[in-house]
């Protein structure tokens, strides 16, 4: 009986591309671009789309594929105006760590803004039945249906804004039912943090799996970010953790370097993951409000300060992480991040 051999046709059809994936081969940037454009134009059948999503998930994503697909999605966003001529930073993770923490990266966005960073946070509702950034911010009164122009104008007004992903990526709405029916995480969970339509120059991006550090760092590098940090936290968090050493990739001037960082190196106490637990929507709203007002538990305050320090580095505001963490902790103790959220809420309600 003859053995099956994978073929690599010079100009593969959709079935040819799928065969490449099933054989464990990666797509070129051009092929990844074509595939994403086909998805956006609804040129593929649901069966074909499901097969590609499964094939990419089974193979694993490469930096070149992620960057090519992200570039297509970012260009497809309906911008209400020219991109703001400002140095912007995003704080967004892939999710999927299963740790059920409170909304740490959301707290970080407002804390970084209180420290002088201009933040354009890209986020969505939770896809897992937990509480996503959009869920908790809407619960605290943020208008997710605000006109896109108003969302952009919030940056100079509040120092921070929130880009609700479905409002900026309407072309992906048609794929949502199929993604839900698959019931597993797909490439779109990885693309979410890469497709901020305002194209921030810097970013802190958390990944729940250590083997995603290099592909995501490589994607950010290819997308041309000036400075970025990709972090996989101790205990499997998709953000820096207080539980032990965190694995980091720093991207600066086109180069990537690896680093491990423990909280005690920044003068922060180690803490068990249980101290960072969230709960249902009401619980997470309460925790977020308390943390931003300076009334959070010590571990909640410290984990936000730790992650905010990475944002301050990415923004170029403070390149000494210990000093940056202290600066973030001071802002939290004074309740300054809550003022930023209140200003944003009022702006989006106008």
Swiss-Prot record:
Annotated positions binding Mg(2+) 2: 238-239
Binding site for Mg(2+) 1: 105, 239
One Pfam family of this chain: Glycos_transf_3
Entry binding sites for 5-phospho-alpha-D-ribose 1-diphosphate: 93, 96-97, 101, 103-106, 121-129, 133
Pathway: Amino-acid biosynthesis; L-tryptophan biosynthesis; L-tryptophan from chorismate: step 2/5
InterPro entries: Anthranilate_Pribosyl_Tfrase, Glycosyl_Trfase_fam3, Glycosyl_Trfase_fam3_N_dom, Glycosyl_Trfase_fam3_N_dom_sf, Nuc_phospho_transferase
Binding site for anthranilate 1: 93, 124
EC number of the protein: 2.4.2.18
Domain of life: Bacteria
Catalytic reactions on record: N-(5-phospho-beta-D-ribosyl)anthranilate + diphosphate = 5-phospho-alpha-D-ribose 1-diphosphate + anthranilate
Assigned keywords, A-Z: Amino-acid biosynthesis, Aromatic amino acid biosynthesis, Glycosyltransferase, Magnesium, Metal-binding, Transferase, Tryptophan biosynthesis
GO MF assignments: anthranilate phosphoribosyltransferase activity; magnesium ion binding
Family: Belongs to the anthranilate phosphoribosyltransferase family.
Assembly behavior: Homodimer.
Name of this chain's protein: Anthranilate phosphoribosyltransferase
Source organism (scientific name): Parasynechococcus marenigrum (strain WH8102)
The encoding gene: trpD
